[in-house]
């Protein structure tokens, strides 16, 4: 299994997976409150200058299902980006989308959230737009995957009983799309010059 995981993932993909797993195990083995207090989105006066908080909330997960699904999508989508483009590009998308999706979620519902799903939706948005505008890069997503993820996004908004960071998902998707629009425009400009 590790060979398969490593074959698809670069160092950033693997590092984020390992960090998420370590943090999850710390949370499960009695350090949950301390870990959350250290890593949650900046909610209190002065925390906005603790810059790690703008992205570290994406490393928190609150159930086995939560972390497994997020890490599988991260590995699948992030691994493709890192292998085809670069580790720097994946890190850029992670940092920008974690900060923006976290800010959106905080603005709407406060700081009681965590998880990689806002970033996962950014990866989806990035691959969707980049695959459409620059198919020669080989980063196209199958339409059923895009459809499934968009339906899942909508379902998050229409069911009131589960704690889902819907705003983080939406802002993540939009931030990934925006980065892809910028990158694809730059790609097309470089091809014409």
Q: What role is predicted for each listed range?
A:
Residues 1-193:
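A detector for small-residue-rich transmembrane helices and their helix-helix packing motifs
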